[in-house]
């Protein structure tokens, strides 16, 4: 298995409902390390840039509005098979279809307020990490 980095966002709904610690604990319990983390309020321009690949899709405007509705926590996670492991921990994108015990099943109820975002590939992880974190802010421990 490869040791790799992945990108995660704890979304406004989970931040508002004080689930940050519980979500980070899930990552750490599964063996992922948080090697960079920051809380911020996304601007519309930041959200539009981050989700540019979805521009023109039916959910894009709602997603941008939601992601700018409150603070988010952006993170870089590190560990064995980090991308796949994080996606497994998150569960299905639609919380109503997420398996019991996954982050989305336990901490969210609807779309797009589904608690977390995670990279879906090594290419996405590299792009998403670079969007929010300069290289010197990502410290492997």
Swiss-Prot record:
One GO cellular component term noted in the UniProt record for this chain: cytoplasm
InterPro entries, per database record: NDK-like_dom, NDK-like_dom_sf, Nucleoside_diP_kinase, Nucleoside_diP_kinase_AS
Signal sequence, start to end: none
EC number: 2.7.4.6
Reactions mediated catalytically: a 2'-deoxyribonucleoside 5'-diphosphate + ATP = a 2'-deoxyribonucleoside 5'-triphosphate + ADP; a ribonucleoside 5'-diphosphate + ATP = a ribonucleoside 5'-triphosphate + ADP
Subcellular location: Cytoplasm
Sorted UniProt keywords: ATP-binding, Cytoplasm, Kinase, Magnesium, Metal-binding, Nucleotide metabolism, Nucleotide-binding, Phosphoprotein, Transferase
Active site: 117
Coiled coil location: none
One Gene Ontology MF term: ATP binding
SMART domains: NDK
First-tier enzyme category under EC: transferase
Function of the protein: Major role in the synthesis of nucleoside triphosphates other than ATP. The ATP gamma phosphate is transferred to the NDP beta phosphate via a ping-pong mechanism, using a phosphorylated active-site intermediate.
Family, per entry: Belongs to the NDK family.
This protein's name: Nucleoside diphosphate kinase
């Amino acid at each position: 298995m490869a040791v790799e980095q992945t990108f995660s966002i704890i979304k406004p709904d989970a931040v508002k409902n004080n689930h940050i610690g519980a979500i980070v604990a899930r990552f750490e319990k599964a063996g992922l390390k948080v090697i960079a983390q920051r809380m911020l309020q996304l601007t519309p321009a930041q959200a539009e840039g981050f989700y540019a690949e979805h521009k023109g899709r039916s959910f894009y405007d709602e997603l941008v509005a939601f992601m700018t509705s409150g603070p988010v926590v952006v993170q870089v996670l590190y560990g064995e098979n980090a991308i796949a492991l994080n996606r497994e921990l998150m569960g299905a994108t639609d919380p109503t279809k997420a398996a019991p015990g996954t982050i989305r099943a336990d901490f969210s109820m609807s779309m797009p307020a589904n608690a977390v975002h995670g990279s879906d590939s090594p290419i996405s992880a590299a792009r998403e990490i670079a969007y929010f974190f300069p290289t010197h802010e990502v410290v492997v421990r």
